[in-house]
From Swiss-Prot:
Assembly: Homodimer. Interacts with FtsZ.
UniProt-annotated location(s): Cytoplasm
SUPFAM superfamilies hit by this protein: Cell division protein ZapA-like
Coiled-coil intervals: 22-81
Keyword terms: Cell cycle, Cell division, Coiled coil, Cytoplasm, Septation
Record-linked InterPro entries: Cell_div_ZapA-like, Cell_div_ZapA-like_sf, Cell_div_ZapA_N
Organism: Actinobacillus pleuropneumoniae serotype 5b (strain L20)
One Pfam family of this chain: ZapA
Similarity comment text for this entry: Belongs to the ZapA family. Type 1 subfamily.
Record protein name field: Cell division protein ZapA
GO terms classed as biological process: division septum assembly; FtsZ-dependent cytokinesis; septin ring assembly
Length: 106
């Protein structure tokens, strides 16, 4: 098997996927978590059709991803606001220092 491909077994099916060597461990862990989520949903819901369970898990994962994107956007906005406030404070502080220095030299 090429170093750029990895075989992953999901629900009894072997998938051969292109994957950089430094990301193979994460891909295997992701496949394991996917199997766990599907098994949990099947147990909790009683749904036995794999296609339905996969669709629900995919929808849940996408929803969680969108929530994380929104959190990241909110965090970015807060950080940008803090940086702007710090920049303004620093500018005021530095402009006040230059005025004080100019007055001392007069």
């Amino acid at each position: 098997m090429s170093a750029n491909y990895i075989e992953v077994q999901i629900f009894g099916q072997v998938l051969r996927l292109h994957c950089p060597p430094d990301q193979q461990e994460n891909l295997l862990a992701s496949a394991q978590r996917l199997e766990e989520r599907v098994a949990l949903l099947k147990d909790q819901s009683g749904i036995i059709q794999l296609e339905k369970v996969l669709a629900i898990v995919a929808l849940n994962l996408n929803y969680e991803l969108e929530q994380e994107k929104q959190k990241n956007a909110n965090n970015k906005a807060v950080l940008e606001s803090c940086i702007h406030q710090l920049d303004n404070s620093l500018s005021k502080l530095l402009s006040g220092s230059s005025v004080a220095i100019n007055q001392e030299s007069v």
